[in-house]
């Protein structure tokens, strides 16, 4: 059996048809979250709190490599288990913090963690970070980190047909040439077949549709 154990059961979808609840974990938890839920069952609370401190430090952009090594040695955790614990806890908090407190209620947050099988005392520690006094500071750090990333300033594309090429299989095969310009001044050019471009259009349209549906559900939830 793997050291990570079997995946924990997950009992609801992004929106529970019975409760109208919006899941902060999405349609199903990521592999990192599922794995950490299994390992937390065998972790003592003292070690978990030290782990949380490291994760919060990482969210603030601190270099925690030495502290991670010290925790692994003092808690007798293998590199594999420690990596899973850190990645899963980091992902869990990030997913909770990306939603405003008005959209994610403490009770719903704790219910989802209970369904994953996370121990109750650890759920309390996670909830205190997601909804406690440190939340405004974590939100501020996340905003600063997000604003430092370049954004798309311009997007251009055109259809190109190669009439003559060294690769005969590409002869007369249309493709789409795209160019992205970012706010940091960099430009990226790439070429994709028409079929892949259509897949991209469909995927973007689907994501936008799901985002709009989620926003409407959150608005209805707040109005109720």
From Swiss-Prot:
Protein name: COMM domain-containing protein 5
Pfam short name (any one): COMM_domain
Localisation per UniProt entry: Nucleus; Cytoplasm
Family that this chain belongs to: Belongs to the COMM domain-containing protein 5 family.
Residues recorded as bearing N-acetylserine in the entry: 2
PANTHER family per record: COMM DOMAIN CONTAINING PROTEIN 5, COMM DOMAIN-CONTAINING PROTEIN 5
Gene behind this protein: Commd5
Purpose of the protein: Scaffold protein in the commander complex that is essential for endosomal recycling of transmembrane cargos; the commander complex is composed of the CCC subcomplex and the retriever subcomplex. May modulate activity of cullin-RING E3 ubiquitin ligase (CRL) complexes. Negatively regulates cell proliferation. Negatively regulates cell cycle G2/M phase transition probably by transactivating p21/CDKN1A through the p53/TP53-independent signaling pathway. Involved in kidney proximal tubule morphogenesis. Down-regulates activation of NF-kappa-B.
Source organism (scientific name): Mus musculus (Mouse)
Recorded GO CC terms: cytoplasm; nucleus
Annotated TM spans: none
Main location, first listed in the record: nucleus
Domain COMM, chain residue ranges per copy: 151-215
């Amino acid at each position: 059996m793997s050291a990570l154990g079997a995946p924990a059961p997950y009992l609801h979808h992004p929106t529970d048809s019975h409760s109208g609840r919006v899941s902060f974990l999405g349609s199903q938890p990521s592999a990192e979250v599922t794995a950490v839920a299994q390992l937390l069952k065998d972790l003592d609370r003292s070690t978990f709190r030290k782990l949380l401190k490291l994760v919060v430090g990482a969210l603030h952009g601190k270099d925690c490599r030495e502290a991670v090594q010290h925790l692994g040695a003092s808690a007798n955790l293998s590199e594999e288990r420690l990596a899973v614990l850190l990645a899963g806890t980091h992902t869990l908090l990030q997913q909770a913090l990306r939603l405003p407190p008005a959209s994610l209620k403490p009770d719903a947050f704790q219910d989802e963690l209970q369904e994953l099988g996370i121990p109750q005392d650890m759920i309390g520690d996670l909830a205190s970070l997601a909804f406690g006094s440190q939340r405004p500071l974590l939100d501020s750090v996340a905003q600063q980190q997000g604003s430092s990333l370049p954004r798309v300033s311009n997007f251009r594309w055109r259809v190109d047909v190669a009439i003559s090429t060294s690769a005969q299989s590409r002869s007369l095969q249309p493709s789409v040439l795209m160019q992205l310009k970012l706010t940091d001044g960099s430009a990226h050019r790439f070429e994709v077949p028409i079929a892949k471009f259509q897949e991209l259009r469909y995927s973007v349209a689907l994501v936008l549709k799901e985002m709009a549906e989620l926003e409407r559900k959150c608005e209805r939830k707040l109005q109720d």
